[in-house]
Each structure stands twice: as structure tokens, then as C-alpha cells.
Regions:
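Helix-rich terminal scaffold detector
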Residues: 1-21, 188-317, 321-327, 438, ...
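Short, glycine/charged-enriched hinge/interface segments at domain edges or termini
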Residues: 2-18, 54, 73-245, 375-386, ...
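Flexible glycine/proline-rich
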Residues: 21-24, 39-45, 52-53, 66, ...
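Short beta-strand-to-loop elements that line the ligand-binding cleft
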Residues: 243, 453-460, 558-572
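Short loop->beta-strand "edge-of-pocket" segments that line small-molecule binding or catalytic clefts
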Residues: 427-436, 524-548
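N-terminal segment of the mature folded domain
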Residues: 448-525
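A ligand-binding cleft/hinge motif common to bilobed small-molecule-binding domains
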Residues: 477-493, 574-603
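Periplasmic-binding protein-like
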Residues: 497-508, 597-626
């Protein structure tokens, strides 16, 4: 196939897909060594930046011998025999030494001077006695009833910081503690590595900025805000320059202008080889050496493009949010920190068991975002799923695990090393794994306002039951209909689990109101009409969900067109029908109403909870059960269109 033909089909192929390490090595070789720009700033303005040079202490701290307590400056030799039975009597000098007051009268043998905490120790004194160990007596004197040793309650000059010692070393990130040390030495200005000026652009005809009206087939631009925030979090000065359509001439002009005014250019989108992806073609025209890596054997993140243009790094991140954020944090942020003179981030790792088999693609190192929960035998890592286009998979994950390029899966039960996104594992108060529902969000909101943290992982009813049996959660939301007993949920429980009633929600067939095939029909008639029309396409639900079980019972052996389209949520089903990508599906009444769809009632299902009996007495579980019976919950659940049993 010729180059022009490949371009016409809109599917060019990556010329060379590199390993992560090889791509980084090429990028670093083109970037470094380089001089780090510096500037002199006040302490307040230097907060969060890295020192460019070692800072030497210009003075001793403290700059004089000072008292650590309120009391009296004395000579220790006068206290040699002092005791309760035989107190030492000392005449008081006629001065009181407060903070900031230079002493005028020396302490001679047999005398003492009143001194406050922080006051400079007078000449002749070599110890401080606490005021509570003394007693005033006649003749303007005190009695001391406890002995003292030389140096007692005195901080000598330079005991904290000595003049000429290295106070802070180059590369130290300036925080509140460092500012305190610098200020204590009288230092007002420091030389720091200047913040990197980073230009951020988003690309794509489909992008709409947050706050604007979402047009058909448009999506809101999340990458611009996310990338800019990540740059700021890591010591950069991000300038978001907006989103640009896939117009090669306009985009090139914007990229050249951005690169001229900034030290780094980061784009998202337009780096794949599909139709409309033009960013990578422009990059090679911006300066030498140009692209050093385009295509990295990572999942997510394969389309990553790395370039250096006349000494300035240019990065084109994948357009999908999870791909963009992972490659940014894993590969780009460490280099930006190095360019800004900042130390590497500290990576924390924990070991966790993987409860489910995770398939992987041979030939690419795959990074899987996971949420951590506490099981009976330690931490358990649940994949967040949702794909590289999902916003929440990165935001809600605790960390990630890696599957090597030579493996096609990670078996269930494997022990995996989890690289954490934060220094510590955030163990939630309550773990809920199973089916999702907007009603569940209401309960979680009540618990959140009560100060409890809840980890909710949507894996479907059967997945939730399996997690509950393995004691990997406290509660599993389920809605499973048993055709044999004609009842919900209870027949599916095993030993160690108990049923907690939740609420009722009406499941039904959804269709576009204009579709005459379903108008006025009941559920049986609607299904017969759909199965009789080969052009009538359905949208199913994912394996393991309660809705999928209901659909399979409804269809029997039939597998109509669209059966293998299996989204994981009610909202996805409604969207498919509303957008004419399917003609019918099964979802709950509130979702159908929100989407403006026709609705044929099918069955009132029971959305209940399988509770792990051994965890019943946990405070968070009790709080959950209390929330289920609260007036706030009952009123909210009715507003959502659900009903409570009884």
C-alpha cells in the first residue's frame, strides 16, 4: 500500500514502536545536559521552588547564649550544696532581662538576675534556675532549693545553626520549614530554579470548552485542565492556550507561537495515525532534531509522541484522558521536574492480590489502574476499568500495576506490586462492591457528610457477590432475579452473607417515542415485535449484571442484532437508544425519563444488599444501615423515582 493510499484510508501505521525505556533514553539524550534557568526571589515567592545553590548560614542561631526558661541567671558553683534542707541564698541584681534586652549588670558570685525565656544570658552566669525552684526572701534576695549544673537551661550561640555551615543544599524544595530556617538567619532573598514556562494546547474538532453548550458529537475538553493542573502541581507555570481544531495551518501557527514564548510545549490529541490527527506531522517542522520517539509499547499510551525542537521539548500526549494522564505522570513529569531542578517524586509501593484475571495485549507493557480494598488476608487490587477514554479511572485509582509485554494476562489470585499515586494507602471506612445505582450515591453522600470514606466499585451483581464471599467488601449491592423461585436476591446468598433490603426500582424496555413498533405495546408484545423485525437493533447489558440476567430470561434462546453490544450502565443503554445507535434496551424508569425515552414497564426489581455477616458490627456498616432508614434517605429515594419496601 502506498503512502497516499494509507493517508486516504485515514489509518497510517506507527513506523517504529519503542519500549518505554528506549523512548525515554532518546528523549533524555536530546534534552540533556542543559542549564537550569535561575532567578532571585523573596522567601514568600520561592515557596515550592528548588534552591539553585547551597545556602550558607551568615550568622549563628541563636546569635547569643539564651535562656530556655523563665527563672534566674546564676553561677552553678553557688548552687553546689543547694537543697530543700539547706537552700542557697542569692542577692538579686537590679535588672530584669527580657527578650530583646541586652544585659547591663554581670552576675557575680552570690548574685542572680531575673531572666525571661529567650533572654540573653548575662556575663558571669553559666546556668539558669527555674522560677518554680526558688523562693523570694527578705533583703531583695531569693532562696534556691535545688542544685544547678553548668549550662543548665541555656542554649549557646550557634547551638542550632553555626555561622558558615550549609543551611540548605541546592535542589532542596522550599517549604514552610525551610522558609523558617532562612528567615531565622536573616536571609530575605534566595536563588531558585525558575519555574518552567509550559504551554498547553488541546487539539480536536470535537472539543468543547467547559461552560459552553455541548454540540452533537462534541465532548468537553478535560485534558487541557488536567494537564495544566498537573504541571502546576509539579512546579511548572502552565499556560493553557485553548483547544484548536484539526486545521493543520492554524494549529502550526499556534504551536510556533506557543513554543516561541515558552520553554516546553505539551499538546493532547492528534498524535495517532487516524484521519484528522495532524499534530505529529507539524512537530517535525518546528525545529531540530524533531521527533525522537513516536509510538511507545505501552497500554495505555501507545500514540505518545516525543520531540525536541531547537532545544525545547515538545510532547504530544494521546487524546484519551487516561492515556494522556498516565503518560504525562509516568514519563513526562519526571523530566519536567529535572528541568526545573526539582528532586524526583517519591514512589511508594505495596503488594496486593488481584482477585480477577486481567487480560493483556502481548508485545505492550500494560499499566492497569487499580483501587485498593482491605481483604481478610491483606490488600486486594480491583481494576478500575472503563478504558483509556475514561476520566474517572485515573482520578479514582489508588495506583497501578504493570503487566509485562511478554504476558497475555495476570491470573486471578496473583500477588502484584502496586505503585501508589499518593505516599500512603487510603483505606476506606466502608467498601461497597457490586451493582451501581443513583440511589447508592444518595447513601454514600449521607455517610460522606458524616465524615466516613466509602470506596464503591461497580462490577455488577454477580461480581459483588463473589467479592462478598471472598470478604473483600463490607456490602455488595445486588438485583438478581431467580426464575425458579420467582424472587429476588435471597436465593443467591451463601453462608456468611445476609440480606439487607434496599429499594425497589422499575425496570423496563426503552425506545424512542417516535418508534411506532413499540407504541402502545406491553413488554411481551414489544419483545415479539423487536425479534420479528431484523432491522430492529437492541443494546444489551454486561455479563454478570442483574439487568443482563433479566434480559436473557426475556429473550430465551434468541440473540437479536445488538445482543453483543454490552455496556456497563443504565445510562449507556439510554444514550444508545436516544442517539439512534440502538432501537431498544432495558433500563430503569428514572434513567429513561431523564433521557426523554418511551418506557414499557417490565418488572419491579429489588435493589438490595448482601452484607458480610462477620463485618456487621463495624461502625461504618452500622452507619450505612442507619442511613438506609433515615428521613433524609427516604425522602431522597422517593424524589429519584424509587420506592422503599413495606
Amino acid at each position: 500500500m502506498t503512502r497516499s493510499t494509507r493517508q486516504d484510508t485515514g489509518q497510517e501505521q506507527f513506523l517504529t514502536v519503542l519500549s518505554r525505556d528506549e523512548a525515554l533514553a532518546r528523549f533524555e539524550a536530546a534534552l540533556f545536559p542543559r542549564t537550569i534557568p535561575t532567578e532571585e526571589l523573596t522567601l514568600a515567592d520561592a515557596l515550592g521552588l528548588a534552591l539553585a545553590d547551597d545556602v550558607m548560614a551568615p550568622i549563628d542561631v541563636p546569635p547569643f547564649d539564651r535562656s530556655n526558661v523563665d527563672g534566674f541567671a546564676v553561677r552553678a558553683a553557688d548552687m553546689a550544696t543547694a537543697s530543700e534542707a539547706l537552700p542557697a541564698r542569692l542577692l538579686l541584681n537590679h535588672e530584669t532581662i527580657a527578650c530583646g534586652v541586652a544585659p547591663q549588670i554581670p552576675v557575680l558570685a552570690g548574685t542572680a538576675t531575673s531572666i525571661s525565656t529567650g533572654g540573653p544570658v548575662p556575663r558571669g552566669a553559666d546556668a539558669i534556675v527555674m522560677v518554680e525552684h526558688t523562693q523570694p526572701t527578705e533583703g531583695d534576695a531569693i532562696e534556691v532549693r535545688r542544685g544547678a549544673s553548668p549550662g543548665q537551661f541555656i542554649s549557646n550561640a550557634g547551638s542550632d545553626i553555626a555561622r558558615g555551615e550549609v543551611l540548605l543544599r541546592a535542589g532542596t524544595v522550599i517549604g514552610s520549614r525551610e522558609i523558617g530556617m532562612l528567615a531565622a538567619c536573616g536571609i530575605a532573598l534566595v536563588t531558585v530554579a525558575r519555574k518552567l514556562r509550559v504551554a498547553v494546547l488541546s487539539t480536536g474538532d470535537e472539543l468543547v470548552q467547559p461552560g459552553d453548550v455541548l454540540r452533537p458529537a462534541g465532548i468537553y475538553d478535560a485534558n487541557g485542565a488536567i494537564v495544566s493542573a498537573a504541571i502546576t502541581e509539579n512546579g511548572g507555570e502552565a499556560s493553557f492556550l485553548g483547544a484548536y481544531p484539526d486545521d493543520e495551518a492554524k494549529l502550526e501557527a499556534a504551536m510556533r507561537e506557543a513554543l516561541a514564548a515558552h520553554e516546553v510545549l505539551i499538546l493532547s490529541g492528534g498524535t495517532s495515525k487516524g484521519a484528522g490527527d495532524v499534530s505529529h506531522r507539524i512537530v517535525n517542522r518546528l525545529g531540530a532534531p524533531g521527533i525522537v520517539a513516536h509510538g511507545v509499547a505501552l497500554k495505555p499510551g501507545k500514540p505518545l509522541c516525543l520531540a525536541v525542537c531547537d532545544g525545547k521539548p515538545v510532547v504530544v500526549l494521546p487524546g484519551f484522558p487516561t492515556s494522556a494522564m498516565f503518560t504525562l505522570h509516568d514519563m513526562i513529569v519526571p523530566l519536567l521536574r529535572r528541568m526545573a531542578g526539582l528532586p524526583p517524586r517519591t514512589e511508594a509501593k505495596v503488594t496486593a492480590k488481584v482477585p480477577l484475571r486481567i487480560p493483556s495485549e502481548l508485545g505492550r507493557t500494560e499499566f492497569v489502574m487499580v483501587s485498593l480494598v482491605e481483604g481478610d488476608e491483606g490488600l486486594v487490587a480491583y481494576p478500575t476499568g472503563k478504558g483509556s477514554g475514561a476520566i474517572t479511572s485515573f482520578a479514582q485509582a489508588d495506583g497501578f500495576i504493570s503487566i509485562e509485554a511478554l504476558a497475555d494476562n495476570m491470573p486471578a489470585g496473583s500477588e502484584a506490586s502496586v505503585t501508589l499515586f499518593t505516599p500512603h494507602v487510603r483505606v476506606p471506612d466502608l467498601v461497597v462492591i457490586g451493582s451501581n445505582c443513583t440511589g447508592l450515591d444518595l447513601v454514600v453522600g449521607i455517610l460522606f457528610r458524616a465524615g466516613l470514606t466509602v470506596r464503591s466499585i461497580a462490577v455488577g451483581s454477580l461480581g459483588g457477590l463473589a467479592a462478598a464471599k471472598r470478604s473483600e467488601c463490607d456490602i455488595a449491592p445486588i438485583h438478581l432475579f431467580d426464575a425458579k423461585t420467582q424472587s429476588y436476591n435471597a436465593p443467591f446468598l451463601s453462608d456468611g452473607l445476609e440480606l439487607v433490603e434496599g429499594w425497589r426500582r422499575m425496570q423496563g424496555i426503552v425506545y424512542r417515542p417516535s418508534d411506532i413498533r413499540f407504541q402502545g405495546a406491553d413488554a411481551d408484545e414489544a419483545v415479539r415485535a423487536a425479534l420479528a423485525d431484523p432491522n430492529c437493533m437492541m443494546v444489551n447489558r454486561n455479563q454478570g449484571s442483574g439487568t443482563r440476567i433479566l434480559i436473557d430470561q426475556l429473550l430465551g434462546p434468541a440473540r437479536p442484532d445488538g445482543y453483543w453490544n454490552q455496556p456497563r450502565s443504565h445510562n449507556a443503554v439510554a444514550a444508545a437508544v436516544a442517539q439512534n445507535r440502538a432501537d431498544w434496551g432495558v433500563t430503569i424508569a428514572p434513567v429513561a425519563q431523564s433521557a426523554g425515552l418511551g418506557f414499557i414497564a417490565l418488572k419491579e426489581e429489588h435493589y438490595d444488599f448482601a452484607l458480610v455477616s462477620a463485618r456487621n458490627e463495624r461502625p461504618a456498616v452500622q452507619a450505612f444501615l442507619t442511613a438506609l432508614t433515615s428521613p433524609e434517605f427516604n425522602e431522597g429515594i422517593e424524589r429519584m423515582g424509587f420506592t422503599r419496601p413495606g
